[in-house]
From Swiss-Prot:
It comes from the Eukaryota. This is Cation channel sperm-associated auxiliary subunit zeta. GO terms for cellular component: CatSper complex; cytoplasm; sperm principal piece. The keyword Membrane applies. Auxiliary component of the CatSper complex, a complex involved in sperm cell hyperactivation. Sperm cell hyperactivation is needed for sperm motility which is essential late in the preparation of sperm for fertilization. Required for a distribution of the CatSper complex in linear quadrilateral nanodomains along the flagellum, maximizing fertilization inside the mammalian female reproductive tract. Together with EFCAB9, associates with the CatSper channel pore and is required for the two-row structure of each single CatSper channel. It is found in: Cell projection, Cilium, Flagellum membrane. Residues 1-29 have a biased composition (Basic and acidic residues). It comes from Homo sapiens (Human). Signal peptide: none annotated. Keywords: Cell membrane, Cell projection, Cilium, Differentiation, Flagellum, Membrane, Spermatogenesis. It is a peripheral membrane protein. One of its GO terms (biological process) is male meiotic nuclear division.
Length: 200
């Protein structure tokens, strides 16, 4: 059973070079796609597909996709498979397609259940949010440091920046723009610190 699909895939790869062929260029492809939408599986190919007779031969040779090498491939396939086997092959493909469509339906049900779960969790989080402070306020409260620790960190930062300023003044000069920029930054930190200390 696994050999048949591999033969079909080999033959379909041989046909891919033709620019003029249509999407439904193969009788087997037409049979498979039409039987998926038909209630009766034993309809003759001539009733289902235009351009084919009762035996599955192409009636219209004017399509331009039939080539001399192609005829030998089709004849080899027809010689190796009887019409009953073709029907069995179509039934196997139909079953495979039904299985994959059922998997798709199951996947849709899974996504629907996930959406429902997300809705219920978001509703419960809305109920919790009514009783809790705003998220931004909560994040600010969590990131706020105690005042003595903040003062300690500011003192260490000012000490490090002052040492860097001295090395800049000695290394690159007092008139360099990086030295002036660092000096302005340190003065700004000192002003903010003094304002906060005088307010408290």
């Amino acid at each position: 059973m696994e050999e048949k699909p591999s033969k079909v895939s080999l033959k379909s790869s041989d046909r891919q070079g033709s620019d003029e062929e249509s999407v439904h260029s193969d009788t087997r492809d037409l049979w498979t796609t039409t039987t998926l939408s038909q209630a009766q599986l034993n309809m003759p190919l001539s009733e289902v597909c235009e351009g084919f007779d009762e035996e599955g031969r192409n009636i219209s040779k004017t399509r331009g996709w039939h080539s001399p090498g192609r005829g030998s491939l089709d004849e080899g396939y027809k010689a190796s498979h009887k019409p009953e086997e073709l029907d069995e092959h179509a039934l196997v493909e139909l079953e495979l397609h039904r299985g994959s469509s059922m998997e798709i339906n199951l996947g849709e049900k899974d996504t629907a259940s996930q959406i429902e779960a997300e809705k219920s969790s978001s509703m419960s989080s809305l109920n919790i949010a009514k009783h809790m402070p705003h998220r931004a306020y909560w994040a600010e409260q969590q990131s706020r440091l105690p005042l003595p620790l903040m003062e300690l960190m500011e003192n260490e930062a000012l000490e490090i920046l002052t040492k860097a300023l001295r090395s800049y003044q000695l290394g690159i000069g007092r008139d360099h723009f990086l030295t002036k920029e660092l000096q302005r930054y340190i003065e700004g930190l000192k002003k903010r610190r003094s304002k906060r200390l005088y307010v408290n």
